[in-house]
Amino acid sequence: MQKARIKLASTNIKALNEVTDQIKQIAERTGVRMSGPIPLPTKRIRITTRKSPDGEGSATFDRFELRVHKRLVDIEADERAMRQIMRIRVPEDVTIEIELIS
């Protein structure tokens, strides 16, 4: 049987967990085997900028950070389950990628 590997990424961890919970519920309802959600390492993007626009004065800096949280879910590629997963309302800040594996 084919498997579907679902990769999820988001800067908002609450929205990410809601989508993974919905996928879990679909797997339980349809009786499909599922492994995950597996938390992948969080990517931290750091940007340091100088506060002063002209370069004069004391050197003070602003530090900004963006965290990208990722999850991985493997699920059997049952037609009913996949159709329901495609219908999930995914928030704008969550990216979802589905790959079929044999």
Curated annotation (Swiss-Prot):
Pfam families referenced in this protein's UniProt entry, alphabetically: Ribosomal_S10
Disulphide bridges: none
NCBIfam families tied to this protein: uS10_euk_arch
Family, similarity comment: Belongs to the universal ribosomal protein uS10 family.
HAMAP family in UniProt: Ribosomal_uS10 (MF_00508)
Gene3D superfamilies cross-referenced by the UniProt entry: Ribosomal protein S10 domain (3.30.70.600)
Its job: Involved in the binding of tRNA to the ribosomes.
GO (cellular component) term, any one: cytosolic small ribosomal subunit
Phylogenetic classification of the source organism: Archaea, Methanobacteriati, Methanobacteriota, Thermococci, Thermococcales
Name of encoding gene: rps10
Keyword Ribonucleoprotein recorded: yes
Keywords: Ribonucleoprotein, Ribosomal protein
The species this protein was found in: Thermococcus kodakarensis (strain ATCC BAA-918 / JCM 12380 / KOD1)
BP GO terms, sorted: translation
Protein name per Swiss-Prot or TrEMBL: Small ribosomal subunit protein uS10
Subunit structure: Part of the 30S ribosomal subunit.
Origin: domain of life: Archaea
InterPro entries on file: Ribosomal_uS10 (IPR001848), Ribosomal_uS10_CS (IPR018268), Ribosomal_uS10_dom (IPR027486), Ribosomal_uS10_dom_sf (IPR036838), Ribosomal_uS10_euk/arc (IPR005729)
GO molecular-function term, one example from the UniProt record: tRNA binding
